[in-house]
Amino acid sequence: MAKTIAYDEEARRGLERGLNALADAVKVTLGPKGRNVVLEKKWGAPTITNDGVSIAKEIELEDPYEKIGAELVKEVAKKTDDVAGDGTTTATVLAQALVREGLRNVAAGANPLGLKRGIEKAVEKVTETLLKGAKEVETKEQIAATAAISAGDQSIGDLIAEAMDKVGNEGVITVEESNTFGLQLELTEGMRFDKGYISGYFVTDPERQEAVLEDPYILLVSSKVSTVKDLLPLLEKVIGAGKPLLIIAEDVEGEALSTLVVNKIRGTFKSVAVKAPGFGDRRKAMLQDMAILTGGQVISEEVGLTLENADLSLLGKARKVVVTKDETTIVEGAGDTDAIAGRVAQIRQEIENSDSDYDREKLQERLAKLAGGVAVIKAGAATEVELKERKHRIEDAVRNAKAAVEEGIVAGGGVTLLQAAPTLDELKLEGDEATGANIVKVALEAPLKQIAFNSGLEPGVVAEKVRNLPAGHGLNAQTGVYEDLLAAGVADPVKVTRSALQNAASIAGLFLTTEAVVADKPEKEKASVPGGGDMGGMDF
């Protein structure tokens, strides 16, 4: 395919037009009085959202240079969303301000590389200031306030705080659509996975269709169990101990399954067989998680363990196991606390090293099952459009709350960024690097000014007033009052603010140092063939 090339000023201006087109659509959503954006979908109802990254993803521009500019800013929003779960609109507003100021200076003759170095040093200084001024999140109320700001709804904030209180900071909080109105919170104690009993004959509570085992032994096998002679020696030992047995294996079939079922029906011996969750390496890892949680070992030929030689010391234990047709919950496994902590640390390390979103999500689920628990927030609404929008807001707020717990909070509303600007004078930079730092200084005002503008106030006046207030005091855009924002519950997670600034600066540096853009030439539409043109003039 033929390419089209643009150089220096023309190239940079083309990219900037694309950036502005996208940023102007996104920035109207910033702040408590920000508006929504309607996104048309090819199929189904349109989506209404105020989430920066969702809006950015939908924007496709026709001009090849503008398209590349917009794609670069999408990257800012997406990266911020991946790292912090929120702050995508702030990142976009910062990127636009940095690029606008930067290109003005490049056009005036400044050296782009000098500007880039100045921007990087200034961002490093601001990040340091943010982390130094962060306040740890200690109370349920602080978590609720932070989540409520992200979701724009206090009831959502309260529910997320309650969920985090129950499952711990490492716990997984998932959001599901509900057929009823309002919000509901469901909690799972212990480790739950999505596999139920292999046979309905294992049920101990016919009314609830559940198999409940109190204080059972837990046998974990990495292969299929099909012959009784392999299982018999171990079964006799378990029966002798007078306890029920949960078998988790790749599969339990044939005479092994029928023996377990017959003994259950006769009342001789209570047991339940369940298939192990996952596939391949993930199944092995999850079985190992269960072994550590319950204090047992996985019976696997890879490590030289076989069923016929197994004894009770290789079995795990738990206070209670509940198995339904779809899922199994292990409550209070008897595993060693240090071993569990070691496994948690190992999974955390794997999450940090993984560059696949899917793998990270699965590892996060495993981590939650070991370290915390699982909470499900069920959201309902009158229409499908409202339901999708609400679910999206709650998911963002959950990630926002987790980010707050991780690195602490600072005053929200764009105030912390603006009030961090004076610290840049300490850098003592010269020449184009000083100009680069000044670009950051100007850009730090952009989020606050945009929040003020979206609230119907004069941005310049608000920025000047906030600049002269004590640290942490600023405009509460929801009420229009100038006050101590942390005390008023207007807070942003440091991780969100920091990521927004770092990602915006990264893309701005690329914009400023661009000297040429190579893009695909737009294809001209081929003229359509007139009707009957290929028929040799024949009539039909």
Curated annotation (Swiss-Prot):
Protein family per UniProt: Belongs to the chaperonin (HSP60) family.
Keyword terms of this UniProt record: ATP-binding, Cell wall, Chaperone, Host mitochondrion, Isomerase, Isopeptide bond, Nucleotide-binding, Secreted, Ubl conjugation, Virulence
Name of protein: Chaperonin GroEL 2
Gene3D superfamilies, alphabetized: GroEL, GroEL-like equatorial domain, TCP-1-like chaperonin intermediate domain
Null mutant phenotype: Essential, it cannot be deleted.
Organism: Mycobacterium tuberculosis (strain ATCC 25618 / H37Rv)
Domain of life the protein comes from: Bacteria
GO cellular component, one term: plasma membrane
Gly residues: bias regions: 530-540
Subunit text: Forms a cylinder of 14 subunits composed of two heptameric rings stacked back-to-back. Also exists as lower oligomers, including monomeric, dimeric, tetrameric and heptameric forms. Forms monomers under standard conditions but oligomerizes in the presence of high concentrations of ammonium salts and either ATP or ADP. Interacts with the co-chaperonin GroES. Interacts with the serine protease Hip1. Interacts with host CD43.
Signals that turn on the gene: Induced in response to heat shock (45 degrees Celsius), pH 10, hyperosmolarity and starvation. Repressed by WhiB1, activated by Cmr.
Taxonomic placement: Bacteria, Bacillati, Actinomycetota, Actinomycetes, Mycobacteriales
GO molecular function, one term: ATP binding
Pfam family name, one: Cpn60_TCP1
Processing and modification events after translation: Cleaved by the mycobacterial serine protease Hip1. Hip1-dependent cleavage of multimeric GroEL2 results in release of cleaved monomeric GroEL2 into the extracellular milieu.
